[in-house]
């Protein structure tokens, strides 16, 4: 009987539980459970928690704990990312651990970037030696620059689809909101201009490629496919621009596409999709990325492969 490996990712938009087995170094028998908690909105500027999200998070963890206890994995890792990095409430962290019955490891942005990279290279067929990995979370965005198949640089930005949505798109999202978000993001991601200059010699010799790992990237693929595109899990900046116009419903030209989206994309994702798309567009423009492909794994898969290979991170 094969060992079971589990990871619980306490993200800013949702809590993800994934339990798997391995066969021939590959993940099999994949079980997934998700709880939308919008945890990224829980933290005040002071690092304190809003009571509404405290209660919601504990209730979600209680449900997850019951699932784990029904069929516990042999190895389990619980990780917290940006939102938990920003919390200065140790009592709440202890409450979370007591509810789960497991310790929580709050990982650094560099650790997160390394695990995302591990998740991508262990699950995704990669042809280029030089590329970017883009991971748009709920409250942070990680960008990993890969040169000659090795990590060159990991950058983390304190903005994600959930927090940007709270800043610009709480009303349905107009073209004015969209433009203002792009201007704001151009400043947030200004550090990427230096990264692009570092890679300018590579840019001359090849089209620059990126792998996207987040819910935003998956939703873009599903959306374009629902419109009749044959994406084959890749898309360009022009495709992103088109999808942004659909989400805004520019000049009411996209009623048909909007209906398709409602039937294709989960409402929790759809509600923050324009903000995630704005982040993706801004990064793509600054880094002059030609093609974005969907990766088959990311942070959770990186944790699972580390557990499988080392029985620890």
Regions found by a protein language model. Name each.
Residues 42-66, 83-94, 98-130, 145-147, ...:
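Helical "lid/coupling" subdomains associated with nucleotide-phosphate turnover
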């Amino acid at each position: 009987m094969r060992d079971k490996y589990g990871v619980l990712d306490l993200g800013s938009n949702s809590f993800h539980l994934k339990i798997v087995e391995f066969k021939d170094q590959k993940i099999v028998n994949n079980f997934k459970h998700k709880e939308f908690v919008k945890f990224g909105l829980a933290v005040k500027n002071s690092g304190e928690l809003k009571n509404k999200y405290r209660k919601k998070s504990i209730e979600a963890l209680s449900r997850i704990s019951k699932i784990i206890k029904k069929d516990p994995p042999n190895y389990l890792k619980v990780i917290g990312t940006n939102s938990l990095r920003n919390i200065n409430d140790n009592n709440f962290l202890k409450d979370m651990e007591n509810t789960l019955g497991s310790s929580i490891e709050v990982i650094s942005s560099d650790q997160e970037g390394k695990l995302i990279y591990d998740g991508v290279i262990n699950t995704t067929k990669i042809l280029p030696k030089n590329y970017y990995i883009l991971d748009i979370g709920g409250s942070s965005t990680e960008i990993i620059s890969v040169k000659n198949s090795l990590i060159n640089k990991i950058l983390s930005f304190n903005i994600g689809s959930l927090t940007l949505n709270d800043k610009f798109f709480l009303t349905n999202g107009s073209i004015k909101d969209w433009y203002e978000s792009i201007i704001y993001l151009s400043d947030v991601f200004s550090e990427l201009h230096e990264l692009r200059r570092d890679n300018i010699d590579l840019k001359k010799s090849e089209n620059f490629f990126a792998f996207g790992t987040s819910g935003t990237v998956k939703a873009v693929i599903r959306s374009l496919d629902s419109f009749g595109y044959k994406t084959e899990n890749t898309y360009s900046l022009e495709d992103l621009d088109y999808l942004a116009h659909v989400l805004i419903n520019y000049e009411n030209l996209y009623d048909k596409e909007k209906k398709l989206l409602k039937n294709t994309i989960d409402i929790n994702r759809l509600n923050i999709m324009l903000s995630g798309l704005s982040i993706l567009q801004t990064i793509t423009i600054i880094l002059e990325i030609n093609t974005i492909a969907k990766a088959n794994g990311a942070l959770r898969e990186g944790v699972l492969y580390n557990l499988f290979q080392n029985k620890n991170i």
